[in-house]
Amino acid sequence: MKFRPLHDRVVVRRVEEESKTAGGIIIPDSAQEKPSQGEVVAVGPGARGDDGKLVALDVKVGDRVIFGKWSGTEVKIDGEELLIMKESDIMGVLEGAASKKKAAA
């Protein structure tokens, strides 16, 4: 990807959630909500604090994150649908999600 976010911006790729319920019912595409989980694909250098010093971001490339339903701006970069959002729009990082993904590969 040839995109570098500025300041405290984060680029996130949505991660599709299960299209089947625990009971085995398949949810059609028209009834599914947009996923609120994603994988961080790029991060900015950070925001400037009150003292003018750069404050690095807590998230890093590869982190699996949860964000609000209406968070971010949808963009298309290199033909891929991505979200650009501020780090403050991210609610949290799913610990161990990235390592499980690598172990499965």
UniProtKB/Swiss-Prot annotation:
Together with the chaperonin GroEL, plays an essential role in assisting protein folding. The GroEL-GroES system forms a nano-cage that allows encapsulation of the non-native substrate proteins and provides a physical environment optimized to promote and accelerate protein folding. GroES binds to the apical surface of the GroEL ring, thereby capping the opening of the GroEL channel. Heptamer of 7 subunits arranged in a ring. Interacts with the chaperonin GroEL. GO terms for biological process: chaperone cofactor-dependent protein refolding. GO terms for molecular function: ATP binding; metal ion binding; protein folding chaperone; protein-folding chaperone binding; unfolded protein binding. It is found in: Cytoplasm. InterPro entries: Chaperonin_GroES (IPR020818), Chaperonin_GroES_sf (IPR037124), Chaprnonin_Cpn10_CS (IPR018369), GroES-like_sf (IPR011032). It comes from Parvibaculum lavamentivorans (strain DS-1 / DSM 13023 / NCIMB 13966). This is Co-chaperonin GroES. The lineage of its organism: Bacteria, Pseudomonadati, Pseudomonadota, Alphaproteobacteria, Hyphomicrobiales.
